[in-house]
Curated annotation (Swiss-Prot):
Gene designation per UniProt: UBP1A
Main subcellular localisation: nucleus
Protein name: Oligouridylate-binding protein 1A
Ranges where the RRM domain occurs: 63-137, 148-226, 269-344
Alphabetic keyword roster: mRNA processing, Nucleus, Phosphoprotein, Repeat, RNA-binding
Superkingdom of the source species: Eukaryota
Modified residues (Phosphoserine): S250
Keyword presence, Phosphoprotein: yes
Quaternary structure note: Interacts with UBA1A and UBA2A.
Protein localization: Nucleus
Region (Disordered): 1-26, 230-268
Keyword Transmembrane: no
Amino acid sequence: MQNQRLIKQQQQQQQQQHQQAMIQQAMMQQHPSLYHPGVMAPPQMEPLPSGNLPPGFDPTTCRSVYAGNIHTQVTEILLQEIFASTGPIESCKLIRKDKSSYGFVHYFDRRCASMAIMTLNGRHIFGQPMKVNWAYATGQREDTSSHFNIFVGDLSPEVTDAALFDSFSAFNSCSDARVMWDQKTGRSRGFGFVSFRNQQDAQTAINEMNGKWVSSRQIRCNWATKGATFGEDKHSSDGKSVVELTNGSSEDGRELSNEDAPENNPQFTTVYVGNLSPEVTQLDLHRLFYTLGAGVIEEVRVQRDKGFGFVRYNTHDEAALAIQMGNAQPFLFSRQIRCSWGNKPTPSGTASNPLPPPAPASVPSLSAMDLLAYERQLALAKMHPQAQHSLRQAGLGVNVAGGTAAMYDGGYQNVAAAHQQLMYYQ
């Protein structure tokens, strides 16, 4: 049964590819001027079969498309000529902006609009990838300004708003989901936000969905940074509702991003450690993160009555690596710890004051190699990043307490991946 389904899907994909090839060939014959290398290039990314749709949006009744990230040299006449390649156009409107323009194209037939999304999304016009999607009014989305938002990281490139919403739809108060898209490349930025009407549902979603598979990747969930919203409803000067897309951009070309998120802010150097057992002490937590060897530890705090603690590092990259390595750790006092970013940045100008190595446990004791390893950590904190890298390479194979090998190199190349970690709020 499963094999038959796969065969059917492959056949549908082949038919779709053949149909697209036929359409593109016809477009080149009808509009050869558009395919001059300096004007319009072939597709540079896979087309969206149905656009990046909001929850509940019905494309079967839509005949309008949004075109974003349009090169400033494109005129309204040229835009109309480009989109007319997929079918007769009822109207075309180009709104010019300083950096990139946007526009709306209304077709007589929705099939022509669908084909425009499939064949023109990602096409390079004057070297700039154009974004094409279904156009719809903001009124089609629920107002989520007072809802509870969670951050979802490590998303697969193919995950759309609809797919993300579907993954969280089991939670009754889930109200919206949006994937953030890169304004320049038209590709997913690998993270998004999900809204909930009920705070408890949001917390439950974080607990249950963190680490679950969505498409081809395990996602990471946590509370969104304060101020990270989907954007307020906007209205144009004529009182009409402004069209806003689900791919993280509005019709004014602004990208709805989370630039101040801790994974993007070098001022964040503190790791939040949750799900701690009541018997875990500050010394226990210090020992654990010391053995990880992620970097120079400056402060360790534990709230035993609340089941969490904080570990502050010398640099942002060290903290990012500690989050990644900490989440891969086995149990600490019979519990799997959960690591993410602390909720406050380290104040500018904070002097570096590394903690000394933690007091040795009765078994095993800290060896001379452990102390040497910590001295190397202190040296790393004072060196140029390139020199740090060289020293890390030279430090391969150094063992520390608990048998952790290659403490300076293990997983360090994956710091960028660790930057998708999330924010915690008390």
